[in-house]
């Protein structure tokens, strides 16, 4: 036999190599041209961005994510990094465009660029997984079972890392947060945010594997795999959350111009919230909830502000949860106070997750010289709080999340572990105008309500303010950029969902599946190559 014929025979044989997991698909390892892959990644990143609020076309997550994953098939390391950066920029550049409203393009480009680098690193791992898995698990069971799980685990691993690092991470943009209005959202009570992201990525990887099948008849049959997984996900009932009474809440949106660069006179923001509350005087409620920064005068240091809060609490015959900035020696805190007429501040919470490069500048000595004009916009550094994120409101335990706190998985778990019956989430969204930022944050709050099995009172200076039930439904909602109040009987619960019981081990497990699967695939692929 000639060398040419022998080589062709060996190639043909390698395409049909049998595996303990089934017969290999011929031509399954074909890859796209680089420019096509880049275009798919950009289209995928843009599609994923549209799945999130404001548009909220959540089914697009099953279009955008598969396109990104498909663009990585067969890519070399540097190609996967380049494709990943393009896909990341398409997603992040669209998803967080709201940063530009008051801060301009530089912070937007910096954050989108940083997140795109992390996105690209995750894509590089996924590209390696495609390459090794095609060799290690060439049979049908490997292609449709093992490989998609590995790919989904690596996607979730990247989300886990960027949600926690650096400087506490940036948890925005996780796949699960796109599903706040979808039937898949209920799953977070069982598997948590990371678990739902894993499931969505798993379905997406299955879609890619079916699309890669070279024989049309096989594609039709094997399409039952992602369809079956989706059907299984939708068949899981909502977690049985049992309510245990209600609390009557008055949540106030003052429509205050409380932005970073707003030209307001001292006390104006406080008066805006007093004016919005005055029509409720005499109404029977258990607690009044004002937003983050609702008192621009620190009532712990300012007698005028303290007197106003005493008067409002007296008129409402109820305690007030009010956001303000407090100081203690050289430390400055973004705080919530529980204020009662006659007693003053009976409890205090200091924000546990202040926003890096917004509420404080980490490693100021390093970063400030790099862009002094930009970082001069952060004249003071908020200190990370040390108090627990709970208030006891006449026997009702309220978990507390100031603005960005709501994206932190650990802080939500701390509330529930501390016995929270309800979650109060005061926030100040004035810096983001009429953009999608506030509805994206509300979507996260909605997912937290379902995940924790708790009602969430999301109260903003300008909106979007809403009260969310433990099942994620909307109890009440206010128009943005208008003063208003929500007075509702809000359900309480002591049910502990599976997501809260399992906690971090869920995300560590699914992330570990990706990492361990990648290592195993690499070892098996190398062994097959040497054999």
Regions inferred by a protein language model and the residue ranges of each:
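Membrane-embedded alpha-helical bundles of multi-pass enzymes
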Residues: 3-8, 13-237, 433-434, 445-448, ...
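Short, conserved active-site loops that position catalytic residues or coordinate cofactors/metal ions
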Residues: 52-67, 91, 253-254, 284-297, ...
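Active-site catalytic loop in hydrolytic enzyme cores
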Residues: 99-106, 133, 162-191, 311-314, ...
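CN hydrolase (nitrilase-like) catalytic-core segments centered on the catalytic cysteine
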Residues: 102, 106, 119, 137-139, ...
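Flexible, glycine- and charge-enriched loops at secondary-structure boundaries
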Residues: 115, 263-270, 435-438
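General beta-strand structural signal in soluble alpha/beta enzymes
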Residues: 162, 167, 322, 348-349, ...
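Soluble catalytic regions of membrane-associated enzymes that act on cell-envelope
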Residues: 236-357, 361, 390-394, 400, ...
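Conserved beta-strand and immediately adjacent loop positions that scaffold enzyme active sites
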Residues: 248, 335, 387, 455, ...
């Amino acid at each position: 036999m000639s060398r040419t014929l022998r080589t062709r025979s060996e190639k043909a044989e390698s395409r049909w190599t049998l595996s303990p997991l089934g017969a290999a698909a011929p031509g399954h390892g074909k890859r796209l041209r680089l420019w096509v892959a880049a275009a798919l990644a950009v289209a995928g990143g843009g599609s994923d961005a549209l799945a999130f609020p404001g548009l909220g076309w959540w089914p697009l997550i099953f279009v955008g994510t598969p396109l990104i994953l498909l663009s990585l098939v067969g890519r070399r390391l540097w190609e996967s990094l380049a494709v990943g950066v393009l896909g990341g920029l398409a997603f992040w550049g669209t998803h967080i465009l709201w940063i530009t409203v008051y801060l301009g393009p530089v912070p937007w480009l910096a954050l989108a660029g940083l997140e795109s680098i992390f996105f690209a690193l995750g894509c590089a791992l996924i590209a390696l997984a495609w390459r090794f898995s095609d060799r290690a698990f060439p049979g049908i069971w490997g292609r449709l079972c093992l490989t998609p799980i590995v790919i989904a685990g690596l996607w979730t691993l990247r989300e886990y890392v960027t949600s926690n690092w650096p400087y506490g991470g940036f948890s925005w943009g996780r796949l699960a947060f796109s599903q706040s209005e979808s039937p898949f959202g209920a799953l977070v009570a069982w598997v948590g945010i990371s678990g739902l992201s894993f499931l969505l990525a798993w379905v997406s990887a299955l879609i890619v594997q079916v699309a890669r099948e070279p024989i049309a008849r096989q594609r039709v049959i094997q399409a039952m795999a992602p369809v079956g997984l989706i059907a299984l996900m939708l068949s899981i009932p909502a977690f049985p959350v049992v309510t245990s009474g209600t609390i009557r809440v008055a949540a106030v949106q003052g429509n205050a111009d409380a932005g970073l660069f707003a030209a307001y006179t001292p006390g104006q923001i406080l008066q805006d919230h007093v004016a919005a509350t005055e029509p409720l005087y005499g109404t029977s409620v258990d607690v009044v909830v004002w937003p983050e920064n609702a008192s621009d005068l620190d009532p712990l240091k300012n007698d005028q502000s303290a007197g106003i809060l005493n008067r409002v609490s007296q008129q409402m015959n109820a305690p007030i949860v009010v956001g303000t900035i407090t100081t203690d020696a050289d430390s400055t805190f973004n705080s919530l106070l529980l204020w009662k007429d006659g007693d003053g501040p009976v409890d205090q919470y200091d924000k546990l997750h202040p926003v890096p490069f917004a509420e404080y500048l980490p490693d100021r000595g390093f970063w400030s010289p790099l862009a002094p004009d930009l970082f001069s916009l952060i004249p003071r550094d908020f200190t990370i709080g040390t108090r627990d994120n709970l208030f006891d409101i006449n026997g009702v335990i309220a978990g507390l999340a100031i603005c960005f706190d709501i994206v932190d998985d650990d802080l939500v778990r701390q509330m529930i572990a501390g016995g929270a019956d309800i979650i109060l989430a005061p926030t100040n969204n004035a810096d983001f105008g009429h953009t999608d930022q506030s509805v994206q944050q509300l979507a996260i709050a909605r997912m937290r309500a379902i995940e924790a099995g708790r009602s969430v009172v999301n109260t903003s200076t300008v909106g979007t303010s809403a009260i969310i039930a433990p099942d994620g439904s909307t109890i009440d909602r206010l128009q943005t950029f208008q003063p208003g109040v929500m007075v509702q009987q809000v359900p309480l619960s002591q049910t502990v969902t599976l997501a809260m019981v399992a906690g971090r081990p869920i995300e560590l497990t699914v992330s570990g599946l990706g990492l361990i699967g990648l290592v195993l695939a690499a070892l098996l692929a190398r062994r097959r190559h040497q054999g």
